[in-house]
Amino acid sequence: MTRRELARMIDHTLLKPDATEAQIRQLCAEGREHGFMSVCVNPYWVPLCAELLSGTEVKVCTTIGFPLGANRSEIKAVEAEDAVARGAREVDMVINVGALKSGRRDVVLNDIRAVVSAVAGEALVKVIIETGLLTDEEKVIACQLAQEAGADFVKTSTGFGTGGATVHDIALMRRTVGAGMGVKASGGVRDLETALAMIGAGANRIGASAGVAILAGLEA
């Protein structure tokens, strides 16, 4: 795998609540320098990132219903619509985990559909299923619902919950959605070895705050 190929699989991420403007600017500078697929930031920072990355191939990615996923679908839809209007081209939404664990598949399906509809094809939708809170059976159901709702990716974790991406979960998610949907590994991917293990298991996108370090490992 070439350096560019790996960089184009990474969402260079900074979602800490105390992230400063200087840190966001640095994130975007690194995004430009290394050619990451996107920078992933909280919604407040979307306009600044869109301005800083204008004219580059680096997309702006943001979060919806983050990190708990427990808001109403209508609110998530408004968040998504606003994010796209301000320059986001990828949105990572959190499912309603409690509804899933309550057996309310209809709620989860409609929740995802609301966001897919809100972006109206102007942004990719990644669905965070928060694997650390789910049984394997629930992970499969969540992936099936995301696929049925028309999302583009399923994603392991917010990074704010228990656990993160594992090879087991990535392989399970890939088997569930097949080749036609993206799988994003996020949470605890901090080095090249882990990133390559996730890719080997079926991930075609990596969410990481350590994107620069991951690429450096390829050059070592």
Curated annotation (Swiss-Prot):
Annotated catalytic residues: 92 (proton donor/acceptor), 155 (schiff-base intermediate with acetaldehyde), 184 (proton donor/acceptor)
Enzyme class: lyase
E.C. no: 4.1.2.4
Principal subcellular localization: cytoplasm
InterPro entries: Aldolase_TIM, DeoC, DeoC/FbaB/LacD_aldolase, DeoC_typeI
Recorded catalytic activity of this chain's protein: 2-deoxy-D-ribose 5-phosphate = D-glyceraldehyde 3-phosphate + acetaldehyde
Source species, domain of life: Bacteria
Pathway: Carbohydrate degradation; 2-deoxy-D-ribose 1-phosphate degradation; D-glyceraldehyde 3-phosphate and acetaldehyde from 2-deoxy-alpha-D-ribose 1-phosphate: step 2/2
Keyword line: Cytoplasm, Lyase, Schiff base
A GO molecular-function annotation: deoxyribose-phosphate aldolase activity
Annotated disulfide bonds: none
Function: Catalyzes a reversible aldol reaction between acetaldehyde and D-glyceraldehyde 3-phosphate to generate 2-deoxy-D-ribose 5-phosphate.
Protein name in the entry: Deoxyribose-phosphate aldolase
Biological classification of the source: Bacteria, Bacillati, Bacillota, Clostridia, Eubacteriales
Gene coding for it: deoC
